[in-house]
Amino acid sequence: MSVLSALTSLTPRIDAAAITAKQLVMSAEEKAKRAQIADTAKTFEASFLSVMTQQMFEGVKTSAPFGGGNGEAMFKSILTDAMSKEISKAGGVGLASTIQREMLKLQGLKE
């Protein structure tokens, strides 16, 4: 077998290996992009829920001796942020999945 015929017979295998390597790299990049999109969608949902819960607590009045004051006003926003993050982490209200689906479409990625 000559060197030329040996190289010719290896060419399809080399091409297939190159394509496979490229697909692995592409899939790693795609996985990273998908993870970033999912995180962004969850963060947006948490922000939305934070605004919602802040508005919900605006109408709640607390009276002395165990409520009210500057401390409550200061920590109420921290409480609503923490609540909204936990709601989102527990599955949210379905907003993150819708946002994620639309962001994937905009990036040209399949669901």
From Swiss-Prot:
Organism: Caulobacter vibrioides (strain ATCC 19089 / CIP 103742 / CB 15) (Caulobacter crescentus)
Listed GO biological process terms: bacterial-type flagellum organization; chemotaxis
Keywords: Bacterial flagellum biogenesis, Chemotaxis
Pfam families, alphabetized: Rod-binding (PF10135)
Protein's name according to its UniProt entry: Chemotactic signal-response protein CheL
InterPro entries assigned to the protein according to its UniProt record, in alphabetical order: Flagellar_prot_FlgJ_N
